[in-house]
Amino acid sequence: ERSVIEEEIKMYADAPDELANDLFNNLVWPDHPLGRPILGTEETLANIDRKVLVGYMKEMYTASNIVIACAGKVEHEELVKLTEKYFGSLPKGERNQCLPAPEFNFVQKWVNKETEQVQICMGAKGVANNDSDEQYQMSVLNAYLGGGMSSRLVQKVREEMSMAYSIYSYHSAYSDVGLWGIAA
């Protein structure tokens, strides 16, 4: 599996749009896990071994850190029995504390890379998941501006002005912070 992840990391590094998004997230949140590449780096992957994974499992996979949810036609008593059967032996452990919300870093950075196209990412503070009133408004705004082929960005920048083949907006909402961005 390590070699598969190594190949994925190399593929991302060779995909200008993915690289631009990773660099953008790192600029926005340089000192926070949200600013790190999801796959990690070749260096972080090389430093993971069985001992690290087992330690992580022991710390994180505890009863205090797990929520079991079920929806649909389910017998409550049967669900409780199954939950106890498969998860009852987990140690209680201590609930992990969430990291504080990262500060939004407003910066510009230009990176030169020999490619056929230019990649641009820009963004602003978005809406967090815990902001129930504004998260739905943000979803509608994002869909209107850049959420598909009929969006304003695609119609104006791609179709009318022929300035980019691909352009879209996105909203990444986390528990206590959000990021709204445009990428082309």
Region annotations inferred by a language model:
Residues N130-S132, R152, Y165, D176-V177:
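Short acidic/glycine-rich loop or secondary-structure boundary segments that cap or lie
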Residues N142-L145, V154, R158, A183:
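Generic hydrophobic alpha-helical scaffold/packing signal
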Residues E1-E94, W110, E159-A184:
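Charge-rich, well-structured scaffold segments of protease-associated domains
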Residues E1, P16-A20, D49, L79, ...:
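Alpha-helical structural motif
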Residues R95-S151:
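His/Glu-based metal-binding/catalytic segments typifying zinc-dependent metallopeptidases
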